[in-house]
Every structure is written in C-alpha cells, then in structure tokens.
C-alpha cells in the first residue's frame, strides 16, 4: 500500500504523466469554435484547471513536483494556434471528403445531408471574407456528378431505392439553384482547374508561445486606442464597403424568418451600409430590406404594434426611398421583378432602359397605415399621447399621396393590371383617411400635404388645384375607383362616398346612391371589415335623416343597428364579452384587431338618443291610435322603446331623469298625456344635443316635431268624444298655425288614420260617428282576441303532448271500424256515449290525428 503513494520517481509516474498530456491534447482538439474564440486568459485558466483535475492518487500529494516539471516543459514548448477561419476551412474540407466518399458508393441520402451542412458552413465563412475556392471546386464537381448520374439513370434499368431517389432529387434541385450564385467562379474553375486552385492564398499558421497568449487583449486594446471598429465573430474587423453591400444584404435576406435572428443588429448593419452606399441601386436595395426588417421587428415584439420611434424611422425611410426613385427614374420598384443575382458587380443600365427592382412601395405604405391604426388602438384615447400620436397621420397621408403619384406615373408609362391594382389600392387608402372627416379638416390635411411635396409633382387623377373643393376631390376618387376597380375596393369606395355625403347633410343623394348600389342585398358576401363600414354608413344616413327632420326615415334606417342592442360590435367600437360565450381566443383577437380607433367612433350615446327620440315620435301617436282600434294592437314600431317605456311605467317611484335614456322616456310620458310643452322642455334639456352641429337648429326641429305629434296624439285620443272641433282652438292649444294644422289633419284623413272631414267654411273638423268603436266595444273585441289566443295555445299544447297518437282519438264513424275509446265492441257511439248532434262530424283541425306508434298498436 505504501508503494502506491510514495513511489513518486518510478516509471509509472512518467507514463501516467504522458497519458495525461495525451488526454489534455485530445480535449483541446474537441473544443468548439465558440470556446476557441474566447479570451486567452480564460483558455489558460481552463487548461490549468484541467491539468490539476488530472492529478490523481499520489500525484495530489506530490503536486509541487508536478508543477515544477510542467513549468520546465512550458518554457520549451510552443502551441500551434489556429484561427477561426482555418478551423472552419478544415470543417469544410471534412464535409467535402464525406461527400466524395458518398459519391463513390452512390449514397445520395448522405450527399444530401452533407451538402446542406456544407452550405451552412460556407455561409459563416462568407460573412468574414470571400468564398473559398475549395467550395467552388466541391459544388462544381458535385454538379458534374449529378449530371453524370442523370445520364446513367436514363440508360440503366436498375432503379434507386426510395431514400436514395429522394436524396438524389433533393440534391439535383438544390445544386442547380445554389450554383446560380457562383456561375462566374465555376466557369473559371472549369477552364483551368489547377491554376484556379493555385491562385488561392495559403493561410499562415500563427505560432506563439503559450505565455504570450495572456497579453493578446492588452496589445489589441493598446492598438485600438485611436478609434473604434466593428468586430465580428472570431475577432475579425468587419469592413463595410460599397463592394460588400450586396453580399451583406443577401445574408440578411436569407436569415429572414429564422429563429434567433437579431433584427436590431441587422438594422444597425444596414444603417451603416446606407452611409457607405455609392450608387442609387445600392440605396434602393438597402432601403427595401431595411424597411421590411423594421416591420418584422414589430411583428416579433410582445406589444403587437410598432413603437413610435421605429414607425417614424420607417416613415422617413419610405420617404427617402420614394425621393430616390423620383430622382432616378431608370430604377423602378415593382412586384414580380427578377432579382439581381451577381453580388460582385452592379447592374449596368443603358440610357433609355429601365431596371426593375423587386419590391412594393404600396405594401410599405399600407403596412405603415396599419401600424399607425394598431398603435392608436392600444393607446388610451383620453390621454395627450393619443392626440400626439394622431398628429402622425399627416406624415402618413403625405407618404400615401406621394406613393400614389409614383405608381400613377408608372401606370401612365406602361399600363398593366398589377400597376392599375397598385393605383387602386393607394387611392383606397387615401379615401379611407378622408371619408369620415368634415370638409374643414380635409382641407387642412390636403393643404399641408401639397406644401410638403415638391412643386414639380402633380396628379392626373386628383390635380393639385382640387384640394380646395373637398366634395369634388372625394367624388373624383370614387368615380375613378368605380371605373377601374371591382369587388371589395369598388364596394368600399361606394360606401365611403355615401358616408361622406350623409356626413355633409346630403341625405337624398346618399339614400339614392345606397339604393342604386344594391349593397343591402349582397353585403353578407363581403368581408367583415366591409360589413362594418356598411353598418357605419347606414347609421350615418339615419343621423343625416334625423338632422333633416325626416323622423320616419331616421327611425327606419337606425332600427336595424340600434334595435339589435349590439351597436358596439356592429360598429367595431368595442367588444361585449358574455359570460358563457363560445368565442375562441383567436376569434377574440381578430375582433380586437378590427376595432376602429377612437377618433373614428360614432357617439353611441348620441346614436341611442336619436333612435329613442325618433321612436318616441312614432310610437306615442301609434299607442293613442291603437287604444280605439284593437285590430292595430299588435303593431309595434320599436320593441326597444316599448320595453323601456313599460319598464318605466312599472316603477313605483320615478324621479327626475338622470341620463339621456330617462330624459327621452320622461318626454314620451308627457307627450302621451298631452302636455307637449313639458315634453319639449324635458327633451331639449338633454345635454347631448350640444354635441351635434348647429344644436339650436336641432332643438327647434325637435320642438316643432313635438307640437305636431302632440296634435296627432290628441286627435287619436279624443276623437270619439267630439262631433266637431275648431281648428282655431287646436292652433291655440299647440301653438301651430292654422295652415299647418289643416295640412296635418288632411294628411291623417287621406291616410285613413282619422274618420273625419275638414269643414273649410267653418274652419272646423267634423268627425264621423259609428266608425270608431266605443270603449265597451273595444273591451269586448280585446276579450275575444284573448280568448282566441288562449284556445289556440291550448290546442297547440295538446298537439305537442299527444303527438304520434292520431288514431287513438279518431272520430270516424264508419261501420265495422274500430273506433276510439268506448267504441271497442259493438254499436256506434261517440266519445262519452253521446250521439253526434245533427250527424255532423267535428270540424277539421285541432286533434284529428292520422297515424303514430300508439295508434298502430291500438289497431292491432
């Protein structure tokens, strides 16, 4: 036992030391690229800890001697340090050898896997320098081998197995696409393979003493005191030059959509590339990629909308892109163009020719618009931040108009369906920022936009001088979209024009356009956002009719939206979450995305007030009319108003009105009682009328409507008690002119609402007796109606409970027939034993059944 611990100078000690060195060397070879690129201090400390961990047994007690031996060896030993590039080249060569070995045995599954690995490895190398020539050799030889295999497959009868065939097809497709990027280099290699490979510079191996590695960082810091430089992976300084712009952009584009992509770092790189860009083509390509990356940054954020800072940067870059395209018309950004593949040189554009660059400025401005709306949706509308953010709409509108001028010019040069579609899309975006605004606001918006645009720019669709006439501007845009677009864009343009006309008190034009468009019939075929716009337009027409004093039209138009009780949802102004709703989280998310910003909302309290007021003017006279005409009892114009009125009447104590709804109901009760003055005072005291344009005019219209409907209510209520009634008396009661009262009474007589005649000689109304029912007769008719309703309900209940027992209660009295209950044996008897009166059978209907399971069982 003692020899194991104290035999320190034996051969076994030296052999174990050799083994430890062998293991440590093997561990160093297996270190990854990332660990190799750490600082020299960390590496030296790790090696020392590894050596210490390797001391076992007696070594741990003889540590001083071991350290002494190692220190002596370190003085004489040197370490070969390989750069990250050399290691990656070695990995590349290893992958190429695996591909060559797989080619010998025709293993295409391995070739496919290793080819993908080869491309990933070379992508890291290209980031720091040129493409390795050994990679060009590998892909050129692989393409030749693929072509040879294709020829062999045509001549041989032996087929590949499934995995081999799948790998071969994959490589055949990818090698062709991959080699397009290196066509020039592959041609050079195939012309003279030996000379091509000899031209490659040999990488020097840096040999340093191990102790010198500890001062590498200090030396680097001392040398870099003069300035800063960007350092990439492996400590290599990244240089941004005009020649490397396209390569950097290709790497960034290829990394889009991949996980763990640092988009902020990519944006910084492209901002530096933009500073060194030396040609318009470089600027255009960088801006196209940079704007797309900014929008990708917003997509991946947790807030689900673009920050104000990033939005303004994107807006500025879009403006710069449009300016560059306007200054250099030889470059055209269009969808569907072929991408320039050669990253080594710039495309040469001959005079008079046009180079098409793939991209879409229309999509950029649409996305910018969507991000602003999404941002406004998430900001509290009652804060100063919302007002400040809303001010950015001017910047957005400037870009929309400028992009419109650009695509409009392209469409004039070369007319095509995609370019016409781009014009339609931008025009629609412009219209959607105008249709809901008053003319004064639109005029300010247009003036500021044309001031910011260069003087040389103008539009053939909406010229610069059209900014002063807002109605003509909206009509021109809509007419253009009617002519050159179809489907959703055309329908939305029509709805926007109708909304604009209704907003500016042109009711009859808006109504006629809505009727002629036939959108009411097929609106269900459109998408949800268009249906929301339809609901908003319908509501705006109703509000316009109310402002014009057309009460019946207003109530009829608003009833579809307001009568449902779901105004918030139908107008996209809020979500009503029910306790037991079956809405999935995805559907709820979509609903929230469809919500309109607060500045586009229609005041729901004002909308409800107008709907209830219109219903009051129609329902109160109708209730007075049906009190003497029971056949009209079931006629209800507004169930919502009736329900609120009934609820209020059931209250034991009713205080003064506390809100808009209570004010309208209280006014309706005064009107029904014949006190039109109190009704007018109560209705005009509602403060929400001050939110409308020209509130004094609205209140005067309401007072006149209350006087007229009060007159109608009075005549319906007290007509049975009069023989004649003086028009002068009515004029004094309701503060209306005799001419107006005569007109109202004439209209009631012509519509057969009032059984009377107008005596113009005596200036009186003569009522006809015997037409209207008395109170007793009305009660009798009401009782008869209720009895019939009760009888029908009882019969329906009996049918439901005895369904399927038709023949069990059959009243047929044919001879020999097996009749119902009590007629099983002999004789013809009716139910209960009484013979039928007068030989008449029971009238059809009711309980005469014809079949069923129980009836069949009784027959048997």
UniProtKB/Swiss-Prot annotation:
- Recorded source organism is Coccidioides immitis (strain RS)
Subcellular compartments: Cytoplasm
Where do Acidic residues bias regions lie?
Answer: 16-53, 67-76
Gene Ontology cellular-component terms for this entry are: eukaryotic 43S preinitiation complex; eukaryotic 48S preinitiation complex; eukaryotic translation initiation factor 3 complex
Quaternary state and partners of this protein?
Answer: Component of the eukaryotic translation initiation factor 3 (eIF-3) complex.
- Name the gene for this chain: NIP1
* Segments passing through the bilayer: none
Comp. bias (Low complexity): 831-847
> What does this protein do, in the record's words?
Component of the eukaryotic translation initiation factor 3 (eIF-3) complex, which is involved in protein synthesis of a specialized repertoire of mRNAs and, together with other initiation factors, stimulates binding of mRNA and methionyl-tRNAi to the 40S ribosome. The eIF-3 complex specifically targets and initiates translation of a subset of mRNAs involved in cell proliferation.
For this chain's UniProt record, which GO biological process terms are given? Answer: formation of cytoplasmic translation initiation complex
Q: Spell out the residue ranges making up region: Disordered.
A: 1-79, 808-860
**In what ranges is there compositional bias, type Gly residues?**
814-830, 848-860
Q: Name one GO molecular function term.
A: translation initiation factor activity
The entry sums up its family as follows:
Belongs to the eIF-3 subunit C family.
Which Pfam family is one of those matched by this entry?
eIF-3c_N
**The protein's name in its UniProt record:** Eukaryotic translation initiation factor 3 subunit C
Domain (PCI) spans 598-772
